[in-house]
A protein has these predicted regions:
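Conserved alpha/beta enzyme-core scaffold
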Residues: 1-267
């Protein structure tokens, strides 16, 4: 089955109010082309999910597209500092911050992948996050041990950027996979944006190349440069000048223009 779509058609699967997950990690292999198209299509009230998020959340908060963020880390790391537009959204109460640990976000996604309403973990006991986010404690029926129940999160749509994909929906991630394989199994719909569309023989010759199997994929988009200005292993480094230009702007519309985003007039 050919799952190849244009970017606009794939992003149109997202509805206002959806929970949307993104693959990659901070400034590495993030699906930025899809994020920019979400803004062009004027999507609103989105719940964003990612373990460690940076440019995506700032773009979507600057555009007024995000209303809730579930993440373990929000920030650019290193020279770029904090996420300005996310911070402004939280401070103005237009964005709800569900602060997690990275592993609790992974656990929430894994619960959805397993098809269960929650999964227990041990590590948050003694943390203020229990009260801040409203996690529940449960008692193990076998040992009597107190554990923390992490509610499953099943994204309505997830976007992953990969180096190679075929038209059937197999995706190859070169380098760290981060949480992408868990996200792919947790999401109700999965969109792969790919640097390169390859023949299906690329995967049939070596099935281990399929980091993401086609059975999980809803749509594939050919998107060379689709993570820029973030980095993609084996393809390109991050574009620091574009990031600096975006972060230098103090007006949200100017920041979006610096990122090369113009809203569609018919959105």
């Amino acid at each position: 089955m050919n799952k190849l779509l244009e970017l606009a058609a794939a992003v149109a699967m997202v509805n206002d109010g959806d929970t949307v997950a993104f693959g990659g990690n901070v400034l590495y292999r993030s699906p930025i082309a899809a994020v920019k198209e979400l803004i062009r299509q004027d999507k609103k009230d989105l719940h964003l999910v990612k373990t460690a998020i940076a440019y995506e959340v700032d773009l979507l908060c600057a555009a007024g597209a995000a209303s809730r963020v579930t993440a373990g880390f929000v920030g650019y790391e290193g020279e770029f500092g904090l996420c300005r537009w996310y911070r402004k959204g939280v401070e103005s109460a237009t964005v709800r911050a569900d602060e997690n640990a990275c592993y609790s976000v992974i656990t929430a996604l894994r619960g959805a992948a397993y098809g269960v309403p929650f999964l227990p973990i041990r590590g948050m006991l003694g943390s203020d996050l229990l009260d801040a986010v409203g996690f529940r404690k449960v008692t193990c029926p076998y040992t009597g041990e107190e554990l923390v129940a992490i509610r499953a999160i099943a994204p309505d749509v997830a976007f992953l950027h990969v180096q190679k994909a075929d038209e059937m929906g197999n995706g190859c991630i070169i380098g760290p996979t981060y949480e992408d394989t868990v996200i792919a199994r947790a999401a109700k719909k999965l969109v792969l944006t790919a640097e390169e569309i390859v023949p299906s023989s690329y995967f049939s010759e070596d099935p281990n190349r399929a980091s993401i199997p086609a059975v999980l994929t809803t749509a594939v988009v050919k998107a060379p440069g689709g993570a820029k200005p973030c980095a993609v292993s084996g393809c390109y480094d991050m574009d620091r000048e574009e990031l600096r230009a975006f972060l230098a702007e103090k007006d949200p519309d100017a920041a979006l223009r610096a990122a090369g985003i113009e809203r569609r007039k018919d959105a």
